[in-house]
Amino acid sequence: MMQSIGSYHHNNMSNHHHRDILNRKRFEIVECLNFQRTLLLNYLRSNHVFDEEDCELIMAEKANRARAGKFIDFLLMKGSEAYQHFLDVIQVENANLYESLTGDKATSRKFSVYF
Protein backbone atom coordinates (compact mmCIF):
# COMPACT_ATOMS: atom_id res chain seq x y z
CA MET A 1 0.00 0.00 0.00
CA MET A 2 1.43 3.36 -0.99
CA GLN A 3 1.56 6.30 1.36
CA SER A 4 0.46 9.68 0.11
CA ILE A 5 3.15 12.33 -0.02
CA GLY A 6 1.46 14.30 2.79
CA SER A 7 1.24 11.20 4.95
CA TYR A 8 4.90 10.35 4.30
CA HIS A 9 5.95 13.91 5.14
CA HIS A 10 3.93 13.84 8.39
CA ASN A 11 5.38 10.44 9.42
CA ASN A 12 8.89 11.58 8.53
CA MET A 13 8.44 14.78 10.59
CA SER A 14 7.02 12.76 13.51
CA ASN A 15 10.00 10.40 13.37
CA HIS A 16 12.42 13.33 13.34
CA HIS A 17 10.58 15.03 16.23
CA HIS A 18 10.58 12.01 18.55
CA ARG A 19 14.22 11.22 17.68
CA ASP A 20 15.15 14.81 18.53
CA ILE A 21 13.37 14.61 21.90
CA LEU A 22 14.96 11.25 22.77
CA ASN A 23 18.42 12.56 21.90
CA ARG A 24 18.03 15.93 23.66
CA LYS A 25 16.54 14.37 26.81
CA ARG A 26 18.74 11.25 26.80
CA PHE A 27 20.54 12.04 30.07
CA GLU A 28 17.28 12.76 31.90
CA ILE A 29 15.62 9.61 30.53
CA VAL A 30 18.59 7.45 31.53
CA GLU A 31 18.47 8.88 35.05
CA CYS A 32 14.70 8.36 35.39
CA LEU A 33 14.07 4.90 33.93
CA ASN A 34 14.02 2.02 36.40
CA PHE A 35 14.48 -1.43 34.93
CA GLN A 36 14.00 -3.13 38.30
CA ARG A 37 10.28 -2.88 37.52
CA THR A 38 9.05 -4.69 34.44
CA LEU A 39 6.01 -2.62 33.45
CA LEU A 40 7.81 -0.65 30.73
CA LEU A 41 9.24 -3.60 28.81
CA ASN A 42 6.18 -5.79 29.33
CA TYR A 43 3.89 -3.07 28.00
CA LEU A 44 6.09 -2.44 24.96
CA ARG A 45 6.29 -6.18 24.26
CA SER A 46 2.52 -6.57 24.52
CA ASN A 47 2.14 -3.78 21.94
CA HIS A 48 4.70 -5.39 19.59
CA VAL A 49 7.15 -2.52 19.95
CA PHE A 50 9.90 -4.75 21.35
CA ASP A 51 10.31 -8.48 20.97
CA GLU A 52 11.81 -10.99 23.39
CA GLU A 53 15.30 -10.58 21.94
CA ASP A 54 15.19 -6.77 22.30
CA CYS A 55 14.22 -7.13 25.97
CA GLU A 56 16.91 -9.74 26.62
CA LEU A 57 19.59 -7.50 25.09
CA ILE A 58 18.46 -4.55 27.21
CA MET A 59 18.33 -6.59 30.41
CA ALA A 60 21.72 -8.19 29.68
CA GLU A 61 23.34 -4.87 30.57
CA LYS A 62 24.64 -4.97 34.14
CA ALA A 63 23.76 -1.47 35.35
CA ASN A 64 20.39 0.26 35.23
CA ARG A 65 21.85 3.29 33.39
CA ALA A 66 23.39 1.02 30.75
CA ARG A 67 20.01 -0.69 30.33
CA ALA A 68 18.32 2.68 29.95
CA GLY A 69 20.86 3.78 27.34
CA LYS A 70 20.41 0.55 25.38
CA PHE A 71 16.62 0.98 25.68
CA ILE A 72 16.80 4.46 24.14
CA ASP A 73 19.01 3.15 21.32
CA PHE A 74 16.39 0.49 20.51
CA LEU A 75 13.51 2.95 20.81
CA LEU A 76 15.23 5.34 18.40
CA MET A 77 15.08 2.61 15.73
CA LYS A 78 11.39 1.81 16.24
CA GLY A 79 9.56 4.89 14.93
CA SER A 80 6.98 7.37 16.12
CA GLU A 81 4.27 4.81 16.99
CA ALA A 82 6.73 3.08 19.34
CA TYR A 83 7.56 6.45 20.89
CA GLN A 84 3.85 7.06 21.52
CA HIS A 85 3.54 3.69 23.30
CA PHE A 86 6.59 4.68 25.38
CA LEU A 87 4.87 7.94 26.36
CA ASP A 88 1.69 6.06 27.28
CA VAL A 89 3.48 3.88 29.80
CA ILE A 90 5.77 6.66 31.08
CA GLN A 91 2.70 8.79 31.79
CA VAL A 92 1.66 6.14 34.34
CA GLU A 93 5.07 5.08 35.61
CA ASN A 94 6.88 8.44 35.77
CA ALA A 95 4.64 11.51 35.48
CA ASN A 96 7.54 13.97 35.86
CA LEU A 97 9.46 12.42 32.97
CA TYR A 98 6.30 12.38 30.84
CA GLU A 99 5.75 16.08 31.52
CA SER A 100 9.37 16.88 30.70
CA LEU A 101 9.21 14.99 27.38
CA THR A 102 5.82 16.27 26.23
CA GLY A 103 5.23 19.56 28.01
CA ASP A 104 1.79 18.18 28.95
CA LYS A 105 0.47 17.32 32.38
CA ALA A 106 0.28 13.59 33.02
CA THR A 107 -3.19 12.20 33.56
CA SER A 108 -4.16 9.23 35.66
CA ARG A 109 -5.50 7.19 32.74
CA LYS A 110 -3.94 4.00 34.03
CA PHE A 111 -6.64 1.86 32.46
CA SER A 112 -5.31 2.57 28.96
CA VAL A 113 -1.93 1.06 29.84
CA TYR A 114 -3.05 -2.09 31.58
CA PHE A 115 -4.12 -5.01 29.51
Please give the residue ranges for each predicted region.
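Death-fold homotypic interaction modules
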Residues: 1-115
